[in-house]
Amino acid sequence: LDPLALHGYSPSFGIMETREKIAASLNKKYGSDYKAANIFMAIGAAGALAHALRAVTNPGDEIITFAPCFSEYKPYTAGAGLKLTIIPADIDTFQINFEALKTQLNENVSAILINSPNNPSGIVYSTETIEKLSSILTAKSKEFHHPIYLISDEPYRDIIFEGVDAPYIANYYNNTLTCYSFSKSISLPGERIGYLAVHPDCSDADKIIEICPQISRTIGQNGAASLMQRTVADVCGYTSDLSVYETNKKILFEALREYGYHCVEPGGTFYMFPRSLEPDSQAFCKKAMEKDLMLVPGDIFGCPGHFRIAYCVPTQRVEKALPVFKKLAEEYR
């Protein structure tokens, strides 16, 4: 390619060839009907979220998400001038707590923000969960006389374990904006490349995409890197060998259960979210750190009393950690 095509400025919406290939890849995999006009190239899923949040809201609007949730949602929504409401977790399943959602939905809610497969729990929202969420949002949109958008944050979409029910969320609700990153699927997190996909039948779909370059100007994100846009155009639809994550999950989950930890089995990602062995998960994680276990307290994910394990490491390191988890559990007996 001409060096200018690789290193020059790209069009504001992203390189057309890349957008076309992404749309075609989604349609082939999920039976959808995206066109290039429905795709906006972004600086990773975070960049896609920054655009999605601003494209379908006004400052002061309310966004609802579900615990446990990615800790960065708080600054992301605050930066857009939005109120973030976090629905308490159903700690037995980590599926959506619908009873709590129904009490919080009101006419000021512009969008629901979900993350499946989920960071930090590793849980994948089931088809039943997504169908129920779609039904509720459809009914409430009619009641409030405005669309309630569903912003689906999906950087872990391709890390799904064998036999897990993993619906493509946009196929169940037209007013869906999907935020995707290639960082996990092809193991390129430092390249910060992703996209926003707006369902073709989404309310004001054309306007949502059209406003994105203007949003880029206001937040200083002036286009995803041209070189990486060209790169992902040739690999969309492919993934790295992600099997190590499922291997690590099986080893870790079975061992923790044997040692007495309570944990909902992950359906994807490379995270696990067990209950802490004491109510204060921050204190528990400090004790773990003294044994060289680096864990993250659940408090920052809106779910105290739990902790996150990341097992995106060589399997030998997971196996090396097992005796330490066992010893830690024994100290609480």
Each model region followed by its residue ranges:
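N-terminal small-domain helix-loop-helix segment of the aminotransferase-like
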Residues: 1-44, 51, 228, 235-238, ...
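Active-site phosphate-binding strand-loop segment of PLP-dependent enzymes
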Residues: 91-162
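Conserved PLP-anchoring active-site segment centered on the Schiff-base-forming lysine
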Residues: 55-77, 90
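Conserved core segment of the aminotransferase class I/II
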Residues: 175-246, 250-253, 323, 329
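PLP-dependent enzyme catalytic core of the Aspartate aminotransferase-like
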Residues: 102, 237, 283-296, 300-333
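Conserved glycine-rich beta-strand-loop-beta hairpin in the small C-terminal domain of fold type I
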Residues: 226-233, 245-257, 263-275, 305
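Alpha-helix termini
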Residues: 29-31, 136-147, 200-206, 332-333
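A short helix-loop-beta submotif of the ANL/AMP-binding
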Residues: 79-85
